[in-house]
């Protein structure tokens, strides 16, 4: 993390997201400040709280993607939630505390996978031994004890080499594996997910882990045995402690569509999903303690990134207390034709590269010319202007329509080369783009 300076973070984000430099800069500084905070003395560290961010911009310009890429970069627990899914405490629906519970679950899963990866080498060794015990049963002496445990036989070593070189992958063996307990499905009303989870866990523990003989190929047996041995090597209590700490110190919560819970002046009467939800969010963002099945989680140092299009409402329509808890405001600009061109070519997994790779699996060679890419970008921009502006998501619709014929016939066009230039794009899209009614329903 020490080498992830704000400039390096922005550079990394640039390889996936086009434009929006101000937003990238804001999240890069927020991430770097976390590293700086961990270098402080304990007395001062607890006083430094993250500066939460409010992203304002139309749909499809990269708000969600910036937060998602940031979490991957930081290897931090991350969750994305829609503000519209929550209701005020006391009403039917999800309560905002479930955000932290879900974030903690995600953290436990992340730490568990890291722990499994860390112990993978040892788990592979133990899995190998179990397979070898089946292939070469140990010889019993007169007292019924297994011999040659300390000094592996030459045959065992030969089989071990064959296992490592995957020569025995297709050989079938019968081996005892932990049977999966029968799942108990419990239907619960919204807001009662925690109770459901605890009941399912209780039934699972009552069933216990039983060994069941199965006849499978060695390749599959090794995979299942590695999973089983990895699970034995990890300490669940330690994982829970690390997961809770990771959430408290590095957790990132992305709240999308926050503009949809703004209470506008002209609306009167009770509204469960608006001002009440904002008030329930206040303690979470300010800092409180939430009870989860993995332990108590303090939210004081969790970074909250809220976003919204704010096409109907304004940021000033949020309740003043919540506005004060989102001190950093970043405005994301609408995408231009030049941005669309860059989106189609520059990211490491751009849409044009994805389609070329997909068609290459069937032997069809796709190439996009610069003129063709410009024409696609112009078409996307034109449809966005004439109908609803959905930003870069329009490119998915346009390209899917453009590639429809190739995708449908790819299995019969093995070895064919298709050059997508300006003429190709015009022939396939001009009629749809120029006809506003068709654009509205098809593109």
From Swiss-Prot:
One of its GO terms (cellular component) is HslUV protease complex. Pfam families: AAA, AAA_2. InterPro entries: AAA+_ATPase, ATP-dep_Clp_protease_ClpX, ATPase_AAA_core, Clp_ATPase_C, HslU, P-loop_NTPase. Keywords: ATP-binding, Chaperone, Cytoplasm, Nucleotide-binding. ATP binds at residues 18, 60-65, 256, 321, 393. One of its GO terms (biological process) is proteolysis involved in protein catabolic process. GO terms for molecular function: ATP binding; ATP hydrolysis activity; peptidase activity; proteasome-activating activity. Signal peptide: none annotated. NCBIfam families: hslU, PRK05201.1. Belongs to the ClpX chaperone family. HslU subfamily. PANTHER family: ATP-DEPENDENT CLP PROTEASE ATP-BINDING SUBUNIT CLPX-LIKE, MITOCHONDRIAL-RELATED (PTHR48102), ATP-DEPENDENT PROTEASE ATPASE SUBUNIT HSLU (PTHR48102:SF3). ATPase subunit of a proteasome-like degradation complex; this subunit has chaperone activity. The binding of ATP and its subsequent hydrolysis by HslU are essential for unfolding of protein substrates subsequently hydrolyzed by HslV. HslU recognizes the N-terminal part of its protein substrates and unfolds these before they are guided to HslV for hydrolysis. HAMAP family: HslU (MF_00249). This is ATP-dependent protease ATPase subunit HslU. It comes from Wigglesworthia glossinidia brevipalpis. The lineage of its organism: Bacteria, Pseudomonadati, Pseudomonadota, Gammaproteobacteria, Enterobacterales. The gene is hslU.
């Amino acid at each position: 993390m020490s080498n992830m300076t704000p400039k390096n973070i922005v550079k990394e984000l640039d390889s996936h997201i086009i434009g929006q430099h101000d937003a990238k800069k804001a999240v890069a500084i927020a991430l770097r400040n976390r590293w700086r905070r961990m270098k402080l003395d304990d007395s001062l560290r607890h006083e430094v709280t993250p500066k939460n961010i409010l992203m304002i911009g139309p749909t499809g310009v990269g708000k969600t993607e910036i937060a998602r890429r940031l979490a991957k970069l930081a290897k931090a627990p991350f969750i994305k939630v829609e503000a519209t899914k929550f209701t005020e405490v006391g009403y039917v629906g999800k309560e905002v505390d479930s955000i932290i519970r879900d974030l903690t679950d995600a953290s436990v899963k992340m730490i568990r996978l890291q722990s499994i990866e860390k112990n993978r080498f040892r788990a592979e060794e133990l899995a190998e031994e179990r397979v070898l015990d089946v292939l070469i049963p140990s010889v019993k002496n007169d007292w019924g004890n297994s011999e040659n445990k300390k000094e592996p036989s030459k045959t065992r070593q030969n089989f071990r080499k064959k296992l490592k070189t995957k020569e025995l992958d297709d050989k079938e063996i019968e081996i005892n594996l932990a049977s999966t307990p029968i799942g108990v499905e419990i239907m619960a009303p919204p807001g009662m997910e925690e109770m459901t989870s605890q009941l399912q866990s209780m039934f699972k523990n009552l069933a216990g882990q039983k060994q069941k003989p199965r006849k499978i190929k060695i390749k599959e047996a090794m995979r299942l045995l590695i999973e089983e041995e990895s699970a034995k090597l990890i300490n669940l209590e330690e994982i829970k402690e690390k997961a809770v700490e990771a959430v408290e110190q590095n957790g990132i919560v992305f709240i999308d569509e926050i503009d949809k819970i703004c209470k506008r002046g002209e609306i009167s009467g009770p509204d469960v999903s608006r001002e009440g939800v904002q008030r329930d969010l206040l303690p979470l963002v300010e800092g409180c303690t939430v009870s989860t099945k993995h332990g108590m989680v303090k939210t004081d140092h969790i970074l909250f990134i809220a976003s919204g299009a704010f096409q109907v409402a304004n940021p000033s329509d949020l309740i003043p207390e919540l506005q004060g808890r989102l001190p950093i405001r970043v405005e994301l600009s609408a995408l231009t034709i030049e941005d669309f061109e860059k989106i189609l070519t520059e990211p490491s997994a751009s849409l044009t590269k994805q389609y070329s790779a997909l068609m290459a699996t069937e032997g069809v060679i796709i190439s996009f010319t610069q003129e063709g890419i410009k024409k696609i970008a112009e078409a996307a921009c034109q449809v966005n202007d004439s109908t609803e502006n959905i930003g870069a998501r329009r490119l998915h619709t346009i390209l899917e329509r453009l590639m429809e014929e190739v995708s449908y016939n790819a299995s019969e066009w093995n070895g064919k080369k298709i050059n997508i230039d300006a003429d190709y794009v015009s022939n396939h899209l001009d009629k749809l783009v120029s006809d506003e009614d068709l654009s509205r329903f098809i593109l």
